[in-house]
């Protein structure tokens, strides 16, 4: 029986995406995230047994490596990368790293125990595909099986993106989802009434996973998933473009986004750590957008821009 090596990194919640990326880059075959914020108030509602996660600002990110991996070298690299992240101003907290061996069948399913139904916005709830769930009146349920390499939709950057979509979509819109990942933003757009959604990702695995998740949700045949490099080569205009990716990538798509967003349409940008906020604002303003909403959770920022000639109540442009 093949065994796997499990490495758990305890860091501040704000460092979740950056640290997950580091773990994948060091050879991890997937990551699972235990965040106490995802379980607050859930026990009484679902009557389930939940992981023993103490309420705090720290989270546990568990990565899985093949048994052939030199774990000492991996841990040394992780510590170096975490120190570098801290030097850039990202809040990582008091970092600790643990490791253990794991059997094949445990590796395949271990991450699922950290993934439970979560009410993300007023209307939207994300539910793992293997969990039975009774939705309340008016509640819109997104079923996800993201696999270990994709987020479960509970990260602040995703939450803010979903909140923005909920506030903007009124029904009948065309939406473009750039860097779709698990497909959660596209599925939400469909449930919120968008007429047509185009979802793009450079990663073929993401394209496959997004399509699988779309197929888990009824009434989502209006979502079209394809491989794509940001908005390059895209000619379809949209009422809303949403992108929840790294700030350094967001600045590369603002000009194309302005070309494609219809007049009075919106651009939602998320995944922005505070130290790179000005860079993203400058890129969007230079493209011609006006800022309508700025959301903040911890070190993370989400921005809602509008393409408009009516600049009352908006900033920039």
UniProtKB/Swiss-Prot annotation:
The keyword Cytoplasm applies. Its main location: cytoplasm. InterPro entries: Ribosomal_L11_MeTrfase_PrmA, Ribosomal_PrmA_MeTrfase, SAM-dependent_MTases_sf. It is found in: Cytoplasm. GO terms for cellular component: cytoplasm. It catalyses: L-lysyl-[protein] + 3 S-adenosyl-L-methionine = N(6),N(6),N(6)-trimethyl-L-lysyl-[protein] + 3 S-adenosyl-L-homocysteine + 3 H(+). Methylates ribosomal protein L11. This is Ribosomal protein L11 methyltransferase.
């Amino acid at each position: 029986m093949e065994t796997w090596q499990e490495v758990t990194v305890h860091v501040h919640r704000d460092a979740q995406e950056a640290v997950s990326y580091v773990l994948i880059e060091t050879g991890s075959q997937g990551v699972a995230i235990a965040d106490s914020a995802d379980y607050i108030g859930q026990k009484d509602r679902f009557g389930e047994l939940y992981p023993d996660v103490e309420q705090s600002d720290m989270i546990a990110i568990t990565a899985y490596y093949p048994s052939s991996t030199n774990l000492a070298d991996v841990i040394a690299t992780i510590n170096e990368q975490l120190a570098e992240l801290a030097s850039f101003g990202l809040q990582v907290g008091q970092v600790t790293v643990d490791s253990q061996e794991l059997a094949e069948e445990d590796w395949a399913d271990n991450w699922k125990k950290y993934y439970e139904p979560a009410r993300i916005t007023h209307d939207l709830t994300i539910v793992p595909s293997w969990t039975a769930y009774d939705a309340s009146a008016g509640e819109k349920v997104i079923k996800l099986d993201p696999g270990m390499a994709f987020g479960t939709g509970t990260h602040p950057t995703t939450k803010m993106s979903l909140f923005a979509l909920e506030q903007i979509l009124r029904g009948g819109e065309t939406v473009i989802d750039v860097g779709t990942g698990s497909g959660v933003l596209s599925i939400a757009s469909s449930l919120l009434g968008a007429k047509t959604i185009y979802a793009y990702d450079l990663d073929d695995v993401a394209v496959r996973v997004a399509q699988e998740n779309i197929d888990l949700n009824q009434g989502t045949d209006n979502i079209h998933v394809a491989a794509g490099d940001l908005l390059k080569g895209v000619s379809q205009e949209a009422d809303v473009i949403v992108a929840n990716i790294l700030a350094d990538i967001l600045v590369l798509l603002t000009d194309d986004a302005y070309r494609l967003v219809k007049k009075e349409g919106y651009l939602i940008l998320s995944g922005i750590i505070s130290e790179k906020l000005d860079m993203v604002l400058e890129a969007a303003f230079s493209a011609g957008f006006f800022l309508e909403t700025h959301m903040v959770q911890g070190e993370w920022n989400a921005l809602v821009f509008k393409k408009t000639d009516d600049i009352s109540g908006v900033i920039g442009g």
